[in-house]
Structures are given as structure tokens and as C-alpha cells.
Amino acid sequence: MVRATPIHRYRNIGIMAHIDAGKTTTSERILFYAGVCHQMGEVHDGAAVMDWMEQEQERGITITSAATTVFWSGMDKSMPQHRFNIIDTPGHVDFTIEVERSLRVLDGAVFVLCAVGGVQPQSETVWRQANKYFVPRMAFVNKMDRTGANFDKVVEQLKARLGAYPVPMQVPIGAEDGFEGVIDLLKMKAIHWDAASQGTVFEYRDIPIELVDKASKARAFMVEAAAEATEELMDKYLNEGELKEQEILEGLRERTLKVEIIPVFCGSAFKNKGVQAMLDGVIHLLPSPADRPPVQGLDEKGNECRCKASDSEPFSALAFKIMTDPFVGSLTFFRVYSGVLNSGDQVYNSVKLKKERVGRILQMHSNQRDEIKEVRAGDIAAAVGLKDVTTGDTLCDQNHIIILERMIFPEPVISMAVEPKTKSDQEKMGMALGRLAQEDPSFRVKTDEESGQTIISGMGELHLDIIVDRMRREFNVEANVGKPQVAYRETIRKSDVKSDYKHVKQSGGKGQYGHVVIEISPMSDVDKQHPDVKGDFLFINEITGGVIPKEFISPIEKGLRETITSGPLAGFPVVGVKVKLVFGSYHDVDSSEMAFKLAASMAFKQGFAKANPVLLEPIMKVEIVSPEDYLGDIMGDVSRRRGILQGQDDSLSGKVINAMIPLGEMFGYATSLRSMTQGRATFAMEFDHYEEAPTNIADTVIKKT
């Protein structure tokens, strides 16, 4: 089959924003104007197409990244048809994992900002994630019809708070109730959308006289930004004082692709103004898969190699999301980087070293699906029938093996115990939690060996609430939930602590003998770069002359690794520790793998106790936005929670307080902040780092365990 849309007309984009910036409404308008939906869904009615989970419709927030394909030929239908693969990502801080994995497979992004709230805490988190993957992006300042809307202030905040270089492509005509349309700085014309046609009909008019001066200055700034792309453009601009429309677009596009500038559009998705012109901007300014650098990976020998975005290259794709569908079972969302895949083909999972057959390939439209026969470089689709694939796995041609760069997921910071309400729920709960953990790499499940309880861990209270909710709705499992628990860690402060342990048992029959001498130290910054570091633990074998035979070295390491999952201090995982195996002895007959494993485990426990062990607690970066009247109360409360104030800022929604607060002090904070400020303040928090817990806190935690 021949490719339906040339690859240079593809745009794989994410719609990203802070919660409540109007991101899902913006996505709904895109679907409407692109002709996918003949009726608009609204978030506040719980009818948004992109928010397809029941919890999303109830809570009015987006939790999972819904993927949708639409086609766009320009606002005036004058451009060749372009294919947009759009991913709508969640804005709540507990779901940053969804944003992270979407960004990994996107080529560009539209950053939706609220014209009233401006750059919010979550905006900064999402921005950092986009920087990490070097994603070219543009901004859409939404909600220009809202009271307090201020386009210029938001542009200023993009510069001040995110360190971006914003280049406005439009100037709004009016604001709040008086928002009428936008001035297109390329054409120097005013665009007015017709309300009766829900914005499908528009007309160009002359710029209102009172805005001519402002528009001219903004255009000069835009043209200058374009001219800086190349020496030729700069020479032409300096000599002639102007550039042609096509030259301006080429210059701006080049700089956007290098992530040097952020083109800024504006409008009101709810009032059907501006989204249409922003879509034209996606075509003009954001990259196609062919514009992005070839994706890097490793071949089977571990050498670096690259995948070019071309159908003629061998097949390679990245699985970026697993989802359980009530009708077809497990769905694997994947992005094709190179080559072609037909339904029924065999693919090789180069991470799991397994071959699998792709049953059906589905083109997803939120949670609707169309079956397709093939996918090509640049496509984003879902496969049915892949059993062993997990998020971050590479799928490739078995004759051309490649492992694409893996995604790194954050460690959970909060845990709680769950138990089934009835005997019949017991079996179903295990299956439900297994499925949910397969879908979401930032969610973990384990069984506490001592109590037999099932412990679930995640990125925040809301994250775990929704997991429990999904268990009830999707899997019909009723569960009782314990109080949230903090994910503490254990480490040591003393270096070069020697520990010598001999495991000997000789009471008739075959005996047991294992003897190890280890040195325990905290990991230095240099140690952290060591190639053998696995999971914040470093094992170094310094045995020479065969004092311990080679076959026992691996069991020794295994014994150590098993011990650090539950530290000697209070049963929390041990982090940041280096163990050197320096000496030992063995017995020709009585030595065994088990004996050395036990000796290593006991040597570690004894050494750890002598190495000044400490408890580490997770510290959260908290940002509180509140009217000024409540500042004193909020700051006092932050101090009572052992928080350290990092500074204050002004935002369009009030004062912004930045603080570092231990997670253990943050449970129930939403309720407390609400009552302190009559519901007028909001906050967002994300994990920042681990820090040594004060002695009184550590003692209390250790006593409880």
C-alpha cells in the first residue's frame, strides 16, 4: 500500500497544560473543527470526548492520555491535508507520568495557558519535562473571554517564570466580555469568527484603529525574531527592513524546531475563537517526524545506532502505554519511528528478547477505535494481542535489532494498605491490581511479608484514590483502604565500616560454610556514575587469589540486594550505599550458594548498624497560590509542618508561596488549606528529594515499625 499522507505532512503533537487551563476543551474544539465530532463536548457537562474514563467525566480532570487522529487543511481549506496525531495529557501533578511518556513519543507540543491564571505550578513541571525531551512547542493563551484575562502579562510570565523566548503571532482584540477576535501579525489583518456557525466561518477585517500601533510593534518584534534564524534572512531584513510572509514563517519555524523561541497564539476555546488559527500555526511551525533528529538506540552488540523516519528503513517502534479495554483486552499504544508494520506481522521485543505476533492494529479516537491494516513511520496506533510488552519496550524487526532509549519512571512516594472486603473480592483484587500496575509504571503493588497485607504505592493521594476507584468500577472489586503511609528510605553516614561474618553449621550430615568480609560506605557522587550501580546500590568485588570461588560471588551480591529491600533500621529500602567484598573463606565440601547468601546478608545487617544509619524522608516541592489576606496564616501553617519557605512571587491569581515540606506533614493538607482560606487558595506539590529525618521523627517511625 502507498502512504496516504506524506510524512512531512504529519504532526505528532501533545496538548499540555496546567489543570483548568482549558486543555480538554481546546482538544474538543480541534475535533469539532477537523470534522471528527459533529457536536462539541464540554468538560463541565462531563461530555468531553477526550475524557473517556468515568472518573475523568466526574472529576472534570484528564487522567490518561487519550490519543486521537484528525486531518486539517487550514482555516480557509487552502493547504494540502495534514494528519495530526494528538495526545491530550493530564494536568494534575499526580499524573505527570502520563505527560512524561507522551512527550517521549511526540514531535511537538501545544502549551495551553489560562489568560487569567498564567503560568501555574504544574506549567513549570510540564515545561521541564518538555525541555528534557527537547520538544519544540508553541503556546496558546486560552480563556481570553474570562474576567481578569491579560495576554501581555502571560507572555511576560513565559519569559520570567519559564525562561522561554515567547514570540506573539497574534494580538488579541479586546479581552474579557469584550474579546472579539485576534490580529494576525503575518497578514496584518483582524480575524473575526462567526458565533452562529460556532466559529467555522470567519472573515478578515481591517485592524481597529486603536490597535494599529500595538500590532505594528508586535509584528516588528516577530519579524526580527524570524530574521535571527539565518544570516541571509538577517541581511535581507537589515537591508530592506521587511521580510515576505513565507520568509517569516521559515525563519520562525527553524527557530521553533531548535527550541529557541515559543510562538504564542491566543483565543477562547469555549467561545470558539482562536483554536482554528492555532491549528494553522501547528502546520506552519511545529515539526513533522522527518524534521526531528533520528531517534537514538543501541544495536544488539551495544553500539549506538539511529533510526531515520522513513518507510524504507527496518521497522522500529516504542510502546509508550498499555491500557485495558473492556472489549478487546490489552491494548499497546506505540509510536512507529521507522519502517512499516502490517497486522498479523511478527515483531521482536528487544528488551524482553521475545517474538510476538501483532493481532490487530487500531487507530484510536479517544476510546473509539477503527481497525487499520498497516502503520508506517510517524504513526501512533494501538496493537491488540501483545502479551509480554510493558511501557518503554522497543518493538523492532528481528533481523535489525535495536533498543530505543528506555523511559525512566519516578519512584512512588506514598503507600497504603488495601484489603478485599469479601472472600470473592480476594482473587479479583490480585488480578485487578496486576492489570493496573501493567498500565501505569508509577504505580506499584507488593505484599508485606510479615503482615500479609497488600501495599499499593503511587505518586500522591489522588493517584491512589483513582486506582481504588478504578478497581471498584472496572473490575467490580470492593476494598477497604488503610491510611496513607510515607515511603521512607534508609542510608548510612559513616564510611569504610568493616563487617566480618562467618555462617557455619555442622551438626551431622552436610554442613554449611560461608565467610565474607565486607566494607560499607555511603555512595559518593563519583560512585553514582559507576557502570555497576543498580537501583541506588553499588556492589564491588575486590576478591583476589580465589579466597572465595567465582561461583559464590553472584549469590553474595544477591544476598546483599535482597537485604537492602528491607533495611535493618525500620524495614524501609536502603539507598545510596556502596559495599566492597574484600575478603572471606570457603570450605571444599560445606560451602554452598545459600551459605554465602546468608553470610552476606548478616554481614550487611551488622555493618549497617555500625555505620551510623539514618532515616530519610521524602521532601515535596509545594506551591500555594492564595489571595494576599491569608498569607500570614498559610506561612505559619507551613512552618508548623516543618516546611522551609523558598520565596514568594506574584501571579495573576494572587500571591505564590514556594516551600519545601516533608510529605509526612502533607496528608489532608487540601482540607486544611480550604478551611484556612474559605476555599480561595490552591496548591500543587511534587516530589523533590530525600532528606535526613529529624531524630524525633525518625524515632517515632522506627517505634511504629
UniProtKB/Swiss-Prot annotation:
GTP binds at residues 17-24, 88-92, 142-145. It is found in: Cytoplasm. Residues 8-290 form the tr-type G domain. GO terms for cellular component: cytoplasm. Gene3D superfamilies: 3.30.230.10, 3.30.70.240, Elongation Factor G (Translational Gtpase), domain 3, P-loop containing nucleotide triphosphate hydrolases, Translation factors. InterPro entries: EFG_II, EFG_III, EFG_III/V, EFG_IV, EFG_V, EFG_V-like, EFTu-like_2, G_TR_CS. Its main location: cytoplasm. One of its GO terms (molecular function) is translation elongation factor activity. Pfam families: EFG_C (PF00679), EFG_III (PF14492), EFG_IV (PF03764), GTP_EFTU (PF00009), GTP_EFTU_D2 (PF03144). Keywords: Cytoplasm, Elongation factor, GTP-binding, Nucleotide-binding, Protein biosynthesis. One of its GO terms (biological process) is ribosome disassembly. The keyword GTP-binding applies. Catalyzes the GTP-dependent ribosomal translocation step during translation elongation. During this step, the ribosome changes from the pre-translocational (PRE) to the post-translocational (POST) state as the newly formed A-site-bound peptidyl-tRNA and P-site-bound deacylated tRNA move to the P and E sites, respectively. Catalyzes the coordinated movement of the two tRNA molecules, the mRNA and conformational changes in the ribosome. HAMAP family: EF_G_EF_2_B. This is Elongation factor G. It comes from Xylella fastidiosa (strain M12). The gene is fusA.
